[in-house]
Amino acid sequence: MTKIHACSGWCALVLMAGMNVAHGKPLAMVGPWEIHSVDPASNGVFFTRMQVAETLVEVDSQGNLQPGLASQWSSSGDGLQWRFTLRPGARFHDGSEVSAEQVAFALQQAWRKPGVMTSAPIASIEAHEGALLVTLTGPFAPLAAVLAHPSTQILAKGAYDAKGEVTQVIGSGPYRITRLQQPQRVETERFDGWQGPQPAISQVSYLTVGRAESRTLMAESGQADIAWGLDPVSIRRLQQAPRVSIVSVTLPRTIQLKLNGADPLLKDPAVRRALSLAIDRRGMAAALLRDPEMAATQLFPPTLGEWHQPGLTPLAYDVKAAQAALAAAGWLLGADGVLHKGEERFALTLRTFPDRPELPLLATALQAQWKAVGVDLKVAVGNSSEIPAGHQDGSLQLGLYARNYALVPDPLVTLLGDLAPAGADWGVMNWQSPAMEQTLARLGKETLPAGEAAALRRDIATTLQQELPLLPIAWYRQSAAVSRELKGFELDPQERSYRLDKLTWSAQ
């Protein structure tokens, strides 16, 4: 077996457990995100961020794989069998042991559902001599990264019903759930059975608050110690507030427009390029995000170092070129100010949602910019679930959302799903490239020399820039309003954890 990764420093953390634990007031957080499910397949990231549940593999701030519930892992020489050794002594919040049998059961439930695990050629998942064995039908280099995805979090047997469906979240993290009121509120408390250093803050609550203005007021008044999901106006206001600080970090996330490649109006790459030319990305980033550097000139942001391509011709704003390209495609401006081709009007509907407050604002700006070239764009602001639903039933024309390309530490895994020939809920729709499919498969199956792998990633980025099955709009900077009484707050650039166990009150 070829060793890939081993635990470092965990024993030192265990020795520190229970030392210097200070008791203070509960921590109150507010954000726009609803707790719509307890199933890791659809809402796992919420419970890993709250540090209730763990995955086998963890990730540091730079995106490097680290031990989680697995203290080490290794693969066979042919890459077909992976062995994960579990962290000794780990226990779930109900007191049961984190055994190899339960880890295998939890991953088997995740494997049988649509999700990131289906991107790996898994033949079997089983417990063997106290370890987890994953057998593959073919080599798959990023398997450990797949097992860092929140949907693969490990829950206790008591979290599942007789059909294998998750009914409650019984994890193994430093915090355990004491109260859950879906879709709005969760309360947690410090888990005394946690092996690492005991968190200084013993109780944490999260409340869903839909309006950004309300979250801002709660942060200003001290009703919330941390407020997430701030719009640019709120950020500017809170920068003047005496009670709070604004903390920001650039994320491997892109605000993008998903296009239905089978729609008669959108199937022509020349038309998609024309629509891209009609988008003033820098203007929107400056006016709406108050951050012109976040204008997306390609799909992959600079934070995705290996995938971002500085040599790509950047996506530009050129209304005249857009008009010329649309005319060349047969679209002529009618008396109503809308493009026509015969009896057909160039009318589209864009779906988005307010969970991230900037999305409706950007959608409205797109509406105005495309109107200037004769596109009649209707904006429908609804629930985030309407975009995947529209993908599944084929009714979606355009969807505006933010996509995190590092939920799996290796972006390749996300791209294998998002760019699959069948498409994906948050990826392409009715668009495919056989050449790209082969390139992605090579990157997944083979351990390639660095230069060759870089060339393949460049080919993928170039194809996406030319074909534009997804229109990049803006890169993403996450901000939070944080009480000045809190010490040790850091935003996770990988968006995996709120790092609540690192926080203390200034009086402590």
Task: Describe each model-derived feature in a short phrase.
Residues Q181, A278-Q309, Q323, E358-Q367, ...:
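Detector for C-terminal structural segments
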Residues S71-P114, L133, L265-K267:
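Aromatic- and charge-enriched surface segment that lines or borders ligand/interaction sites
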Residues A148-P199, Q203, R211-E213, H308, ...:
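Gly/Pro-rich hinge or "lid" segments in bacterial periplasmic/extracellular proteins
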Residues F191-R237, T364-Q367, D376-K378, S384:
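Ligand-site clamp/hinge motif
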Residues V30-G77, T85, Q108, I170-G171:
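N-terminal lobe/hinge region of extracytoplasmic solute-binding protein
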Residues T85, V116-G158:
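Surface-exposed binding/hinge segments that line
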Residues G31-R49, L69-A70, S96, A141-T152, ...:
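A structural "hinge/loop" feature
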